[in-house]
Amino acid sequence: MSFALSDNFIEKYKRKRAPFGFNGLGELVYMRTYSRLKEDGKNEMWWETVQRVVQGTYNMQKKHIERYDLGWNAWQAQRSAQEMYERIFNMKFLPPGRGLWSMGTALTEEKGLYAALNNCAFVSTNNLKDDLSKPFTFLMDASMVGVGVGFDTKGAESFVIR
């Protein structure tokens, strides 16, 4: 069973104005960049994005705790998730942009592709002669979930293609 914030808690935020600031520019950037398209064809509102992100975070935490039998405390989780929601909604802290975009979506919830939460990654070409495809496979996989990938040139001229 997945984690969900209580309906009564969420109800308080549905009509509350988010403090985007910057004379409307903050909301414009949010709508363009982080608000996901819902099944009904409409974009998420801020309260929905925050709900998706917080629930996705606590789903990930719950899976980990239950997998290792660490003792999930539903009441404590609900309380701390509500505090997290409140702080994100009021922009006291914000997750990284990749977290706003990916957390709580099918990428993380169904496919387990938590790499999509990373902004960037690095791969070395130092051992190209041992495994020619490894750095390029990593680059492709990471790029496909939106991660920017940097690399070095240590493997340059370590083999000849004829």
Question: Where are the model-predicted features located?
Answer:
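Extended catalytic cores of very large enzyme megasubunits
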Residues: 1-162
